[in-house]
Amino acid sequence: MSAKEKFTSISPAEFFKRNPELAGFSNPARAMYQALRELVENALDATDVHEILPSIKVIIERTSQEKEIYRLTVEDNGIGIPPHVVPDAFGRVLYSSKYVLRQTRGMYGLGVKAAVLYSQMYQDKPIEITTAPLNSKRIYSFKLKIDVTKNEPIIYERGSVNNDTGYHGTSVSMYILGDWMRAKSRVYEYIKRTYIITPYAEFYFKDPEGNVVLYPRLTNKMPVPPKEVKPHPYGVDIELLKNMISRQKEDTTVKEFLVKEFQSVGEKTALSVIEMAGLDPDKRVQKLTDDQLSKLVDAMKNFPDFRPPSPEALSTIGADLIELGLKQTFNPEYVGAVTRRPKAYQGHPFIVEVGLAYGGDIQPSEEPTVLRYANKIPLIYDEKSDVVWKVVEEIDWKRYGIEDEQLPLVVMVHLCSTKVPYKSAGKESIADVEEIEKEIRNGIMEASRSLKTFMTEKRKEEEARKRLLTYLKYIPELARSLSIFVTDGKKELAPKVQEEIQNKMIDLVVTKLNIKDKDLELFKSYRVETL
Protein backbone atom coordinates (compact mmCIF):
# COMPACT_ATOMS: atom_id res chain seq x y z
CA MET A 1 0.00 0.00 0.00
CA SER A 2 1.36 3.44 -0.88
CA ALA A 3 2.40 5.58 2.09
CA LYS A 4 0.71 8.54 0.40
CA GLU A 5 -2.68 6.84 0.14
CA LYS A 6 -5.31 8.63 2.23
CA PHE A 7 -8.49 7.29 3.77
CA THR A 8 -11.60 9.32 4.42
CA SER A 9 -15.31 8.90 4.98
CA ILE A 10 -18.27 10.58 3.33
CA SER A 11 -21.75 11.33 4.58
CA PRO A 12 -24.86 9.47 3.34
CA ALA A 13 -25.87 12.65 1.52
CA GLU A 14 -22.52 12.80 -0.25
CA PHE A 15 -22.79 9.13 -1.21
CA PHE A 16 -26.20 9.50 -2.86
CA LYS A 17 -25.21 12.78 -4.50
CA ARG A 18 -22.33 10.91 -6.15
CA ASN A 19 -24.53 7.92 -7.00
CA PRO A 20 -28.02 9.29 -7.80
CA GLU A 21 -28.82 6.34 -10.08
CA LEU A 22 -28.99 4.08 -7.00
CA ALA A 23 -32.11 5.97 -5.92
CA GLY A 24 -33.65 6.11 -9.39
CA PHE A 25 -32.25 9.47 -10.57
CA SER A 26 -30.18 8.17 -13.48
CA ASN A 27 -31.19 10.74 -16.14
CA PRO A 28 -33.49 13.79 -16.43
CA ALA A 29 -36.52 11.80 -17.62
CA ARG A 30 -36.21 9.13 -14.94
CA ALA A 31 -35.42 11.77 -12.31
CA MET A 32 -38.56 13.73 -13.16
CA TYR A 33 -40.70 10.62 -12.76
CA GLN A 34 -38.88 9.53 -9.59
CA ALA A 35 -39.17 12.91 -7.86
CA LEU A 36 -42.88 13.12 -8.61
CA ARG A 37 -43.37 9.58 -7.39
CA GLU A 38 -41.61 10.23 -4.08
CA LEU A 39 -43.76 13.30 -3.42
CA VAL A 40 -47.04 11.56 -4.31
CA GLU A 41 -46.22 8.55 -2.14
CA ASN A 42 -45.45 10.77 0.84
CA ALA A 43 -48.77 12.53 0.25
CA LEU A 44 -50.69 9.25 0.23
CA ASP A 45 -48.89 7.97 3.34
CA ALA A 46 -49.91 11.21 5.08
CA THR A 47 -53.57 10.59 4.25
CA ASP A 48 -54.83 7.04 3.85
CA VAL A 49 -52.53 5.55 6.50
CA HIS A 50 -54.27 7.96 8.90
CA GLU A 51 -57.78 7.28 7.55
CA ILE A 52 -58.12 10.59 5.71
CA LEU A 53 -59.73 10.41 2.26
CA PRO A 54 -56.89 11.68 0.02
CA SER A 55 -57.21 14.80 -2.11
CA ILE A 56 -53.94 15.13 -4.03
CA LYS A 57 -52.98 18.00 -6.32
CA VAL A 58 -50.01 17.55 -8.70
CA ILE A 59 -48.70 20.42 -10.84
CA ILE A 60 -45.65 20.41 -13.14
CA GLU A 61 -44.51 23.77 -14.60
CA ARG A 62 -41.58 24.58 -16.83
CA THR A 63 -39.73 27.56 -15.34
CA SER A 64 -36.80 27.98 -17.75
CA GLN A 65 -36.67 28.10 -21.52
CA GLU A 66 -32.87 27.84 -21.62
CA LYS A 67 -32.72 24.63 -19.57
CA GLU A 68 -35.44 22.10 -18.91
CA ILE A 69 -35.96 23.16 -15.31
CA TYR A 70 -39.37 22.24 -13.93
CA ARG A 71 -41.21 23.13 -10.74
CA LEU A 72 -42.91 20.07 -9.24
CA THR A 73 -45.62 20.74 -6.69
CA VAL A 74 -47.57 18.10 -4.78
CA GLU A 75 -50.18 19.13 -2.21
CA ASP A 76 -52.15 16.84 0.11
CA ASN A 77 -54.80 17.10 2.82
CA GLY A 78 -52.96 14.79 5.20
CA ILE A 79 -51.89 14.99 8.83
CA GLY A 80 -49.17 17.55 8.14
CA ILE A 81 -45.65 17.55 9.58
CA PRO A 82 -44.66 18.96 13.00
CA PRO A 83 -42.60 22.10 12.26
CA HIS A 84 -39.61 20.99 14.35
CA VAL A 85 -39.38 17.82 12.20
CA VAL A 86 -39.60 19.47 8.76
CA PRO A 87 -35.90 20.40 8.33
CA ASP A 88 -34.65 16.88 9.06
CA ALA A 89 -37.52 15.20 7.19
CA PHE A 90 -36.45 16.95 3.98
CA GLY A 91 -32.80 17.77 4.69
CA ARG A 92 -31.19 14.77 6.38
CA VAL A 93 -30.65 11.57 4.38
CA LEU A 94 -31.80 8.36 6.13
CA TYR A 95 -34.00 10.30 8.57
CA SER A 96 -37.59 9.08 8.47
CA SER A 97 -40.80 8.28 10.32
CA LYS A 98 -40.84 4.97 8.46
CA TYR A 99 -38.21 3.03 10.43
CA VAL A 100 -40.93 1.09 12.21
CA LEU A 101 -42.43 -2.35 11.67
CA ARG A 102 -45.47 -1.15 9.77
CA GLN A 103 -46.27 -1.15 6.08
CA THR A 104 -45.51 2.18 4.43
CA ARG A 105 -44.91 3.19 0.83
CA GLY A 106 -41.46 4.49 1.69
CA MET A 107 -38.83 2.38 3.42
CA TYR A 108 -35.39 3.93 3.58
CA GLY A 109 -35.76 7.57 4.65
CA LEU A 110 -34.16 8.33 1.32
CA GLY A 111 -36.68 9.08 -1.44
CA VAL A 112 -37.57 12.76 -1.12
CA LYS A 113 -34.04 13.59 0.12
CA ALA A 114 -32.57 11.95 -2.98
CA ALA A 115 -34.86 14.20 -5.02
CA VAL A 116 -33.61 17.25 -3.11
CA LEU A 117 -29.99 16.22 -3.74
CA TYR A 118 -30.70 15.79 -7.45
CA SER A 119 -32.46 19.17 -7.49
CA GLN A 120 -29.39 20.89 -6.02
CA MET A 121 -27.08 19.43 -8.66
CA TYR A 122 -28.52 21.41 -11.59
CA GLN A 123 -30.11 24.60 -10.22
CA ASP A 124 -29.89 26.94 -7.19
CA LYS A 125 -33.41 27.18 -5.77
CA PRO A 126 -34.19 25.45 -2.47
CA ILE A 127 -37.09 23.10 -1.83
CA GLU A 128 -40.24 24.83 -0.52
CA ILE A 129 -42.45 23.22 2.13
CA THR A 130 -45.75 24.50 3.53
CA THR A 131 -47.43 22.40 6.21
CA ALA A 132 -50.07 22.47 8.93
CA PRO A 133 -50.48 19.53 11.32
CA LEU A 134 -53.98 18.45 12.33
CA ASN A 135 -55.65 21.05 14.60
CA SER A 136 -52.69 23.40 14.21
CA LYS A 137 -53.39 27.12 14.72
CA ARG A 138 -50.45 28.00 12.47
CA ILE A 139 -49.37 27.19 8.91
CA TYR A 140 -45.60 26.78 8.67
CA SER A 141 -43.34 27.40 5.68
CA PHE A 142 -39.71 26.49 4.99
CA LYS A 143 -37.13 26.86 2.24
CA LEU A 144 -34.12 24.59 2.60
CA LYS A 145 -31.33 22.58 1.01
CA ILE A 146 -29.11 19.74 2.20
CA ASP A 147 -25.56 20.34 3.40
CA VAL A 148 -24.01 17.43 1.51
CA THR A 149 -20.83 17.26 3.60
CA LYS A 150 -22.56 17.28 6.98
CA ASN A 151 -25.79 15.53 5.92
CA GLU A 152 -27.92 18.16 7.62
CA PRO A 153 -30.45 20.76 6.47
CA ILE A 154 -29.55 24.31 5.50
CA ILE A 155 -32.58 26.48 6.29
CA TYR A 156 -32.86 29.58 4.08
CA GLU A 157 -36.27 30.75 5.26
CA ARG A 158 -38.82 29.74 7.86
CA GLY A 159 -42.06 31.38 8.90
CA SER A 160 -45.66 30.87 9.92
CA VAL A 161 -49.07 32.50 9.56
CA ASN A 162 -52.40 32.10 11.31
CA ASN A 163 -54.45 29.09 10.24
CA ASP A 164 -57.92 30.63 10.12
CA THR A 165 -59.47 28.02 7.82
CA GLY A 166 -58.67 24.81 9.71
CA TYR A 167 -56.35 23.71 6.89
CA HIS A 168 -54.23 20.62 7.42
CA GLY A 169 -51.82 18.97 5.03
CA THR A 170 -48.55 19.58 3.24
CA SER A 171 -47.47 21.23 -0.01
CA VAL A 172 -43.98 20.57 -1.38
CA SER A 173 -42.40 22.31 -4.38
CA MET A 174 -39.00 21.54 -5.86
CA TYR A 175 -37.12 22.57 -8.99
CA ILE A 176 -35.42 19.86 -11.02
CA LEU A 177 -33.73 19.29 -14.35
CA GLY A 178 -36.16 17.10 -16.28
CA ASP A 179 -37.13 15.83 -19.71
CA TRP A 180 -40.91 16.07 -19.98
CA MET A 181 -41.29 14.60 -23.45
CA ARG A 182 -39.45 11.42 -22.43
CA ALA A 183 -40.98 11.27 -18.96
CA LYS A 184 -44.54 12.11 -20.03
CA SER A 185 -45.86 8.62 -20.72
CA ARG A 186 -44.35 7.23 -17.50
CA VAL A 187 -45.77 10.05 -15.38
CA TYR A 188 -49.27 9.65 -16.79
CA GLU A 189 -49.05 5.87 -16.41
CA TYR A 190 -47.89 6.23 -12.81
CA ILE A 191 -50.82 8.46 -11.87
CA LYS A 192 -53.29 6.17 -13.67
CA ARG A 193 -51.95 3.08 -11.94
CA THR A 194 -51.97 4.82 -8.57
CA TYR A 195 -55.62 5.73 -9.12
CA ILE A 196 -56.50 2.11 -9.98
CA ILE A 197 -55.68 0.97 -6.43
CA THR A 198 -56.81 4.16 -4.64
CA PRO A 199 -60.33 4.72 -6.02
CA TYR A 200 -61.10 6.37 -2.67
CA ALA A 201 -58.71 9.22 -3.59
CA GLU A 202 -59.19 12.18 -5.90
CA PHE A 203 -56.35 13.53 -8.02
CA TYR A 204 -55.86 16.83 -9.84
CA PHE A 205 -52.99 16.72 -12.33
CA LYS A 206 -51.72 19.59 -14.49
CA ASP A 207 -48.81 18.93 -16.84
CA PRO A 208 -46.28 21.44 -18.28
CA GLU A 209 -48.32 21.73 -21.49
CA GLY A 210 -51.31 23.04 -19.56
CA ASN A 211 -53.36 19.85 -19.81
CA VAL A 212 -55.49 19.15 -16.74
CA VAL A 213 -56.74 15.68 -15.80
CA LEU A 214 -59.17 15.06 -12.94
CA TYR A 215 -59.50 11.66 -11.33
CA PRO A 216 -62.70 11.69 -9.23
CA ARG A 217 -63.19 9.81 -5.99
CA LEU A 218 -65.24 6.66 -6.72
CA THR A 219 -65.90 5.50 -3.16
CA ASN A 220 -65.47 6.52 0.45
CA LYS A 221 -64.46 3.00 1.44
CA MET A 222 -60.81 2.85 2.51
CA PRO A 223 -58.46 -0.01 3.39
CA VAL A 224 -57.85 -0.72 7.06
CA PRO A 225 -54.64 1.16 7.95
CA PRO A 226 -51.61 -0.78 9.22
CA LYS A 227 -50.59 -0.90 12.87
CA GLU A 228 -47.08 -0.69 14.26
CA VAL A 229 -45.97 -4.07 15.64
CA LYS A 230 -43.02 -5.45 17.57
CA PRO A 231 -40.27 -7.36 15.74
CA HIS A 232 -40.76 -11.09 15.21
CA PRO A 233 -37.98 -13.32 16.61
CA TYR A 234 -37.37 -14.93 13.20
CA GLY A 235 -36.40 -11.54 11.76
CA VAL A 236 -33.79 -10.61 14.36
CA ASP A 237 -30.02 -10.37 13.89
CA ILE A 238 -27.19 -9.51 16.27
CA GLU A 239 -27.00 -5.83 15.32
CA LEU A 240 -30.76 -5.34 15.70
CA LEU A 241 -30.60 -7.12 19.05
CA LYS A 242 -27.77 -4.86 20.25
CA ASN A 243 -29.69 -1.78 19.17
CA MET A 244 -32.81 -2.91 21.03
CA ILE A 245 -30.83 -3.82 24.15
CA SER A 246 -29.17 -0.39 24.21
CA ARG A 247 -32.60 1.17 24.82
CA GLN A 248 -33.41 -1.04 27.84
CA LYS A 249 -33.22 -0.12 31.51
CA GLU A 250 -30.15 -1.38 33.35
CA ASP A 251 -32.06 -3.91 35.44
CA THR A 252 -34.03 -5.48 32.53
CA THR A 253 -33.52 -9.25 32.51
CA VAL A 254 -33.19 -11.45 29.42
CA LYS A 255 -36.65 -12.94 30.04
CA GLU A 256 -38.27 -9.51 30.52
CA PHE A 257 -36.58 -8.24 27.38
CA LEU A 258 -37.90 -11.07 25.19
CA VAL A 259 -41.45 -10.84 26.55
CA LYS A 260 -41.63 -7.04 26.29
CA GLU A 261 -39.90 -6.39 22.96
CA PHE A 262 -40.97 -9.24 20.64
CA GLN A 263 -44.28 -10.43 19.25
CA SER A 264 -45.32 -14.07 19.79
CA VAL A 265 -43.25 -14.33 23.00
CA GLY A 266 -44.88 -14.98 26.37
CA GLU A 267 -43.12 -16.02 29.57
CA LYS A 268 -43.28 -19.74 28.80
CA THR A 269 -41.95 -19.25 25.27
CA ALA A 270 -39.23 -16.89 26.51
CA LEU A 271 -37.99 -19.46 29.02
CA SER A 272 -37.88 -22.14 26.30
CA VAL A 273 -35.84 -19.89 23.98
CA ILE A 274 -33.46 -18.92 26.80
CA GLU A 275 -32.98 -22.59 27.69
CA MET A 276 -32.13 -23.36 24.02
CA ALA A 277 -29.53 -20.58 24.15
CA GLY A 278 -28.07 -21.89 27.43
CA LEU A 279 -28.56 -18.56 29.22
CA ASP A 280 -29.77 -17.44 32.64
CA PRO A 281 -33.28 -15.90 32.30
CA ASP A 282 -32.57 -13.53 35.21
CA LYS A 283 -29.30 -12.22 33.80
CA ARG A 284 -29.32 -8.51 32.94
CA VAL A 285 -29.71 -8.28 29.18
CA GLN A 286 -27.15 -5.46 28.91
CA LYS A 287 -24.52 -7.76 30.44
CA LEU A 288 -24.73 -10.36 27.65
CA THR A 289 -21.46 -10.96 25.79
CA ASP A 290 -21.21 -11.09 22.00
CA ASP A 291 -20.98 -14.88 22.20
CA GLN A 292 -24.13 -15.04 24.33
CA LEU A 293 -25.95 -12.67 21.96
CA SER A 294 -25.00 -14.93 19.06
CA LYS A 295 -26.41 -17.96 20.90
CA LEU A 296 -29.62 -16.05 21.69
CA VAL A 297 -30.08 -15.06 18.04
CA ASP A 298 -29.52 -18.67 16.90
CA ALA A 299 -32.08 -19.90 19.42
CA MET A 300 -34.64 -17.30 18.29
CA LYS A 301 -34.19 -18.21 14.64
CA ASN A 302 -34.43 -21.95 15.27
CA PHE A 303 -37.17 -22.12 17.89
CA PRO A 304 -39.96 -24.13 16.19
CA ASP A 305 -43.06 -22.97 18.07
CA PHE A 306 -43.33 -19.23 17.40
CA ARG A 307 -46.61 -18.10 15.89
CA PRO A 308 -46.30 -16.59 12.38
CA PRO A 309 -45.57 -12.83 12.21
CA SER A 310 -48.62 -10.65 12.86
CA PRO A 311 -50.33 -9.34 9.71
CA GLU A 312 -51.69 -6.33 11.65
CA ALA A 313 -48.72 -4.34 10.36
CA LEU A 314 -50.05 -4.75 6.81
CA SER A 315 -52.75 -2.90 4.90
CA THR A 316 -54.19 -4.67 1.88
CA ILE A 317 -56.16 -2.93 -0.85
CA GLY A 318 -59.00 -5.45 -0.77
CA ALA A 319 -60.74 -7.30 -3.59
CA ASP A 320 -63.63 -4.82 -3.80
CA LEU A 321 -61.39 -1.78 -4.33
CA ILE A 322 -59.17 -3.64 -6.81
CA GLU A 323 -62.20 -4.64 -8.88
CA LEU A 324 -63.61 -1.10 -8.72
CA GLY A 325 -60.33 0.41 -9.94
CA LEU A 326 -59.92 -2.10 -12.78
CA LYS A 327 -63.53 -1.60 -13.91
CA GLN A 328 -63.19 2.18 -13.96
CA THR A 329 -59.93 2.12 -15.91
CA PHE A 330 -60.38 -0.74 -18.40
CA ASN A 331 -64.17 -1.28 -18.68
CA PRO A 332 -63.56 -5.04 -18.94
CA GLU A 333 -65.95 -7.82 -19.78
CA TYR A 334 -64.76 -9.71 -16.70
CA VAL A 335 -63.03 -8.57 -13.52
CA GLY A 336 -62.09 -10.51 -10.41
CA ALA A 337 -59.68 -10.18 -7.50
CA VAL A 338 -58.39 -12.19 -4.55
CA THR A 339 -56.56 -11.30 -1.34
CA ARG A 340 -54.43 -14.20 -0.13
CA ARG A 341 -53.89 -15.25 3.48
CA PRO A 342 -50.84 -13.79 5.27
CA LYS A 343 -47.49 -15.55 4.82
CA ALA A 344 -44.01 -14.79 6.11
CA TYR A 345 -40.39 -14.69 4.97
CA GLN A 346 -37.35 -13.99 7.15
CA GLY A 347 -39.64 -13.05 10.03
CA HIS A 348 -41.58 -10.48 8.00
CA PRO A 349 -45.29 -10.91 7.17
CA PHE A 350 -46.49 -10.39 3.61
CA ILE A 351 -49.76 -10.64 1.70
CA VAL A 352 -50.27 -11.04 -2.05
CA GLU A 353 -53.30 -9.66 -3.88
CA VAL A 354 -54.17 -10.42 -7.50
CA GLY A 355 -56.67 -8.79 -9.84
CA LEU A 356 -57.59 -9.97 -13.34
CA ALA A 357 -59.50 -8.07 -16.02
CA TYR A 358 -60.45 -9.55 -19.39
CA GLY A 359 -62.01 -8.27 -22.61
CA GLY A 360 -64.03 -5.09 -22.95
CA ASP A 361 -61.86 -2.08 -23.79
CA ILE A 362 -58.57 -3.90 -23.08
CA GLN A 363 -56.35 -3.91 -26.16
CA PRO A 364 -55.29 -7.46 -27.14
CA SER A 365 -51.55 -8.14 -27.24
CA GLU A 366 -49.20 -11.11 -27.34
CA GLU A 367 -48.55 -10.76 -23.61
CA PRO A 368 -50.87 -9.77 -20.76
CA THR A 369 -50.68 -6.20 -19.47
CA VAL A 370 -48.98 -6.58 -16.08
CA LEU A 371 -49.61 -4.05 -13.30
CA ARG A 372 -47.10 -4.46 -10.46
CA TYR A 373 -47.51 -2.91 -7.01
CA ALA A 374 -45.55 -3.10 -3.77
CA ASN A 375 -47.00 -1.53 -0.61
CA LYS A 376 -49.47 0.29 -2.88
CA ILE A 377 -46.68 1.74 -5.04
CA PRO A 378 -47.01 1.25 -8.82
CA LEU A 379 -43.79 -0.21 -10.23
CA ILE A 380 -43.33 1.19 -13.75
CA TYR A 381 -39.67 0.62 -14.68
CA ASP A 382 -37.61 -2.60 -14.83
CA GLU A 383 -40.67 -4.75 -15.52
CA LYS A 384 -38.89 -7.74 -17.03
CA SER A 385 -36.49 -8.09 -14.08
CA ASP A 386 -39.32 -8.39 -11.55
CA VAL A 387 -40.39 -11.69 -9.99
CA VAL A 388 -44.01 -10.84 -10.88
CA TRP A 389 -43.20 -10.81 -14.59
CA LYS A 390 -41.27 -14.07 -14.22
CA VAL A 391 -44.35 -15.78 -12.73
CA VAL A 392 -46.81 -14.29 -15.26
CA GLU A 393 -44.64 -15.52 -18.14
CA GLU A 394 -44.83 -19.07 -16.80
CA ILE A 395 -48.64 -19.16 -16.63
CA ASP A 396 -50.31 -21.21 -19.38
CA TRP A 397 -53.41 -19.09 -19.98
CA LYS A 398 -54.96 -21.72 -22.23
CA ARG A 399 -55.51 -23.81 -19.10
CA TYR A 400 -57.87 -21.08 -17.97
CA GLY A 401 -59.92 -20.87 -21.13
CA ILE A 402 -58.05 -18.12 -22.99
CA GLU A 403 -57.36 -19.65 -26.39
CA ASP A 404 -56.56 -16.49 -28.37
CA GLU A 405 -52.98 -15.72 -29.35
CA GLN A 406 -53.75 -12.04 -28.70
CA LEU A 407 -54.64 -11.63 -25.01
CA PRO A 408 -57.06 -8.86 -23.94
CA LEU A 409 -55.92 -9.49 -20.37
CA VAL A 410 -54.70 -7.37 -17.45
CA VAL A 411 -52.90 -9.06 -14.55
CA MET A 412 -52.52 -6.92 -11.43
CA VAL A 413 -50.32 -8.12 -8.54
CA HIS A 414 -49.88 -6.31 -5.22
CA LEU A 415 -47.33 -7.34 -2.59
CA CYS A 416 -47.57 -5.74 0.83
CA SER A 417 -45.01 -6.39 3.54
CA THR A 418 -43.11 -4.74 6.37
CA LYS A 419 -40.02 -5.47 4.26
CA VAL A 420 -40.43 -5.58 0.48
CA PRO A 421 -37.32 -7.19 -1.05
CA TYR A 422 -36.61 -4.55 -3.69
CA LYS A 423 -33.65 -5.11 -5.98
CA SER A 424 -32.41 -1.53 -5.48
CA ALA A 425 -33.10 1.68 -3.56
CA GLY A 426 -35.01 2.90 -6.63
CA LYS A 427 -37.86 0.54 -5.59
CA GLU A 428 -38.86 -0.56 -9.09
CA SER A 429 -38.60 -4.35 -9.06
CA ILE A 430 -39.12 -7.13 -6.53
CA ALA A 431 -36.39 -9.72 -5.95
CA ASP A 432 -36.85 -13.46 -6.45
CA VAL A 433 -37.59 -14.54 -2.88
CA GLU A 434 -38.81 -18.13 -2.92
CA GLU A 435 -41.70 -17.68 -0.49
CA ILE A 436 -42.96 -14.58 -2.29
CA GLU A 437 -42.61 -16.09 -5.77
CA LYS A 438 -44.60 -19.14 -4.69
CA GLU A 439 -47.37 -17.03 -3.18
CA ILE A 440 -47.62 -14.80 -6.28
CA ARG A 441 -47.98 -17.92 -8.42
CA ASN A 442 -50.66 -19.35 -6.12
CA GLY A 443 -52.49 -16.02 -6.11
CA ILE A 444 -52.59 -15.78 -9.90
CA MET A 445 -53.74 -19.38 -10.16
CA GLU A 446 -56.51 -18.81 -7.61
CA ALA A 447 -57.76 -15.69 -9.40
CA SER A 448 -57.52 -17.48 -12.75
CA ARG A 449 -59.86 -20.25 -11.65
CA SER A 450 -62.72 -17.75 -11.47
CA LEU A 451 -61.69 -16.43 -14.88
CA LYS A 452 -61.79 -19.98 -16.22
CA THR A 453 -65.36 -20.39 -14.94
CA PHE A 454 -66.32 -17.16 -16.70
CA MET A 455 -64.62 -18.24 -19.94
CA THR A 456 -66.38 -21.62 -19.82
CA GLU A 457 -69.77 -19.96 -19.37
CA LYS A 458 -68.96 -17.48 -22.10
CA ARG A 459 -68.06 -20.28 -24.51
CA LYS A 460 -71.31 -22.09 -23.68
CA GLU A 461 -73.28 -18.90 -24.30
CA GLU A 462 -71.57 -18.37 -27.65
CA GLU A 463 -72.32 -21.94 -28.73
CA ALA A 464 -75.95 -21.60 -27.61
CA ARG A 465 -76.18 -18.30 -29.49
CA LYS A 466 -74.92 -19.90 -32.67
CA ARG A 467 -77.48 -22.69 -32.38
CA LEU A 468 -80.22 -20.20 -31.66
CA LEU A 469 -79.36 -18.06 -34.65
CA THR A 470 -79.40 -21.17 -36.81
CA TYR A 471 -82.97 -21.84 -35.70
CA LEU A 472 -83.93 -18.19 -36.12
CA LYS A 473 -83.02 -18.35 -39.79
CA TYR A 474 -86.25 -20.27 -40.34
CA ILE A 475 -88.55 -17.62 -38.82
CA PRO A 476 -88.79 -15.49 -42.00
CA GLU A 477 -89.66 -18.57 -44.06
CA LEU A 478 -92.21 -19.63 -41.46
CA ALA A 479 -93.74 -16.14 -41.45
CA ARG A 480 -94.06 -16.19 -45.23
CA SER A 481 -95.73 -19.61 -45.21
CA LEU A 482 -98.13 -18.57 -42.47
CA SER A 483 -99.00 -15.37 -44.33
CA ILE A 484 -100.00 -17.40 -47.39
CA PHE A 485 -102.14 -19.66 -45.20
CA VAL A 486 -103.79 -16.79 -43.30
CA THR A 487 -104.60 -14.77 -46.45
CA ASP A 488 -105.89 -17.83 -48.23
CA GLY A 489 -103.42 -17.26 -51.05
CA LYS A 490 -104.32 -13.61 -51.64
CA LYS A 491 -100.95 -12.26 -52.72
CA GLU A 492 -101.94 -8.60 -52.33
CA LEU A 493 -102.50 -9.12 -48.56
CA ALA A 494 -99.62 -11.52 -47.89
CA PRO A 495 -96.73 -8.98 -47.62
CA LYS A 496 -98.38 -6.95 -44.87
CA VAL A 497 -99.46 -10.07 -42.95
CA GLN A 498 -95.98 -11.58 -43.34
CA GLU A 499 -94.39 -8.43 -41.89
CA GLU A 500 -96.77 -8.44 -38.92
CA ILE A 501 -96.19 -12.13 -38.18
CA GLN A 502 -92.43 -11.74 -38.48
CA ASN A 503 -92.32 -8.69 -36.18
CA LYS A 504 -94.42 -10.41 -33.53
CA MET A 505 -92.22 -13.49 -33.66
CA ILE A 506 -89.11 -11.29 -33.35
CA ASP A 507 -90.57 -9.50 -30.32
CA LEU A 508 -91.52 -12.83 -28.74
CA VAL A 509 -88.07 -14.35 -29.27
CA VAL A 510 -86.24 -11.21 -28.13
CA THR A 511 -88.32 -11.03 -24.93
CA LYS A 512 -88.31 -14.71 -24.02
CA LEU A 513 -84.67 -15.43 -24.90
CA ASN A 514 -83.18 -12.06 -23.96
CA ILE A 515 -81.41 -11.63 -27.30
CA LYS A 516 -78.87 -8.80 -27.31
CA ASP A 517 -78.91 -5.98 -29.85
CA LYS A 518 -75.94 -7.30 -31.82
CA ASP A 519 -77.64 -10.71 -32.16
CA LEU A 520 -80.90 -9.04 -33.15
CA GLU A 521 -79.18 -7.17 -35.96
CA LEU A 522 -77.64 -10.43 -37.15
CA PHE A 523 -81.02 -12.13 -36.98
CA LYS A 524 -82.67 -9.36 -39.01
CA SER A 525 -80.16 -10.00 -41.77
CA TYR A 526 -81.79 -13.41 -42.26
CA ARG A 527 -85.15 -11.89 -43.29
CA VAL A 528 -86.39 -12.97 -46.67
CA GLU A 529 -88.12 -10.67 -49.06
CA THR A 530 -91.85 -10.47 -48.66
CA LEU A 531 -94.09 -11.94 -51.30
Curated annotation (Swiss-Prot):
Pfam families: HATPase_c, Topo-VIb_trans
Reaction catalysed by this enzyme: ATP-dependent breakage, passage and rejoining of double-stranded DNA
Keyword list, A-Z: ATP-binding, DNA-binding, Isomerase, Nucleotide-binding, Topoisomerase
This protein's name: Type 2 DNA topoisomerase 6 subunit B
GO terms of molecular function: ATP binding; DNA binding; DNA topoisomerase type II (double strand cut, ATP-hydrolyzing) activity
Gene3D superfamilies: 1.10.8.50, 3.30.230.10, Histidine kinase-like ATPase, C-terminal domain (3.30.565.10)
InterPro entries: HATPase_C_sf, Ribosomal_Su5_D2-typ_SF, Ribosomal_uS13-like_H2TH, Ribsml_uS5_D2-typ_fold_subgr, TopoVI_B, TopoVI_B_transducer
Subunit structure: Homodimer. Heterotetramer of two Top6A and two Top6B chains.
Gene: top6B
SMART domains for the chain: HATPase_c
Lineage, broadest ranks: Archaea, Thermoproteota, Thermoprotei, Sulfolobales, Sulfolobaceae
Keyword Signal attributed: no
Species whose genome carries this gene: Metallosphaera sedula (strain ATCC 51363 / DSM 5348 / JCM 9185 / NBRC 15509 / TH2)
Binding-site positions, ATP: 42, 76, 97-98, 106-113, 427
NCBIfam families assigned to the protein according to its UniProt record, in alphabetical order: PRK04184.1, top6b
EC number: 5.6.2.2
Keyword RNA-binding listed: no
GO annotation (BP), single: DNA topological change
CDD domains: TopoIIB_Trans (cd00823)
Role this protein plays: Relaxes both positive and negative superturns and exhibits a strong decatenase activity.
Membership in a protein family: Belongs to the TOP6B family.
